[in-house]
Amino acid sequence: MTTLLPALDLAQLDALDARDPLAHKRAEFDLPGDIIYLDGNSLGALPRRVPARLSQVATEEWGHHLIRSWTRNAEAAQDWMALPDRVAAKLAPLLGAGAHEVAVGDSTSVNTFKALAAALRLSGRRVILSDADNFPTDLYVAQGLARLLGDVEVRTAPGDEMTQHFTDDVGVVLLTEVDYRTGRRLDMRAITAAAHARGIVTVWDLAHSAGAFAVDLGGAGADFAIGCGYKFLNGGPGAPAFLYVAERHLDRAEVVLSGWMGHADPFEMARAYAPAPGARRFVVGTPQVLSLSALDAALDVFGDVDLGALREKSLSLTDTFIRLMEPLAEQYPLELVTPLAHAERGSQVSYRHPHAQQVMAQLIECGIVGDFRTPDILRFGFTPLYLSHGDVGRAVAGIAAVLDELEGPA
């Protein structure tokens, strides 16, 4: 049986939690008491305020007021019609964006298509460059757009060599700020500057960034960005995604999926499309009221959160996990693939293990919920709003027990 000699004892973990300025946020989530949830980077936990909001929307707004709810109480910001704009206004500060630069709705994949198409038009070039190991949907969407347009080429390159492939024929670079497998965080500001120096338009995927730490799209000079609402933003399964368009591009970026909800006056029922002001023009169809309402309520959790403290806790949690895992990495075939440098780390920690799928299945069975990514990645997500350092210690103890049971020390 392995003897775990942690770098931090339980008293130290308790002391870290006692000083945690975000400790009170845990009570705002409905978390099962029999698990340690390290998978908020796949699906965020349920904020307690969401069920009541959904019940209100379903029984009162839909059930009682019916179609009147589309415009009812607009002066009090309670109408459905402007719900995407209200959600965008709550989300924008987490992205370092203005509310008018953010559109909320559709899925991440659909928004990626919109962003890539608009970015290509702006660039006047025909090559999309992406990380060879980018999240598959980003690559699939780029490939589909290339097939549709016919004269567009999709190129890929290793992530750590990306800027070396910024050639004069590249029009758009599509990158994910935090790698979904390793948790490695890219330097958005530096890469964007390098892209702009070569006349390249940037599209950033923030799926593993938004809600995990403060994103600064404006400060980084990003052109476009997309992301989902169901991971660190806790908007629930299938939550609407978002699309960011830098203000300098709003009047020039072409809306290739032009729908009536992106029209300047939808109920004019005009025969020709006229774009709405700001990023709202990128909203395509009828707002998904139920899922938008869930995301709207979930974002209220961030209302009193200092984003600097959020990042500090994220790094403290992941530092603690890495230190506590060191004895296990010495005894078992565990390879840390997440960077140690804070500037290069998101809010997850990943290890390679030859039997990662089996190990993760057993961990989940024991109540330690992370996830597996092919071919050999154990992935653990750390959501600062509802995880504690004590959770980290208990998780590592559970991981040690599972590894002992499955294979014994290497």
Swiss-Prot record:
Name the UniProt record assigns to this protein = Kynureninase
Protein encoded by which gene: kynU
Task: Give GO terms for biological process.
Answer: anthranilate metabolic process; L-kynurenine catabolic process; L-tryptophan catabolic process to kynurenine; NAD biosynthetic process; quinolinate biosynthetic process
Molecular function terms, GO-annotated: kynureninase activity; pyridoxal phosphate binding
Q: Which metal ions or organic cofactors does this protein require, according to UniProt?
A: pyridoxal 5'-phosphate
Q: What is the lineage of its organism?
A: Bacteria, Thermotogati, Deinococcota, Deinococci, Deinococcales
Pfam families assigned: KYNU_C
**What family is this protein classified in?**
Belongs to the kynureninase family.
Q: In which pathway does it act?
A: Amino-acid degradation; L-kynurenine degradation; L-alanine and anthranilate from L-kynurenine: step 1/1; Cofactor biosynthesis; NAD(+) biosynthesis; quinolinate from L-kynurenine: step 2/3
Tell me the InterPro entries matching this sequence. Answer: Kynureninase, PyrdxlP-dep_Trfase, PyrdxlP-dep_Trfase_major, PyrdxlP-dep_Trfase_small
Q: Which GO terms describe its cellular component?
A: cytoplasm
SUPFAM superfamilies (UniProt xref): PLP-dependent transferases
EC number of the protein: 3.7.1.3
Q: How does it assemble?
A: Homodimer.
Q: What reactions does this protein catalyze? A: L-kynurenine + H2O = anthranilate + L-alanine + H(+); 3-hydroxy-L-kynurenine + H2O = 3-hydroxyanthranilate + L-alanine + H(+)
Q: What does this protein do?
A: Catalyzes the cleavage of L-kynurenine (L-Kyn) and L-3-hydroxykynurenine (L-3OHKyn) into anthranilic acid (AA) and 3-hydroxyanthranilic acid (3-OHAA), respectively.
Q: Which UniProt keywords apply?
A: Hydrolase, Pyridine nucleotide biosynthesis, Pyridoxal phosphate
Residues recorded as bearing N6-(pyridoxal phosphate)lysine in the entry: 231
Residues given in the record as pyridoxal 5'-phosphate binding sites? 108-109, 135-138, 176, 205, 208, 230, 260, 286
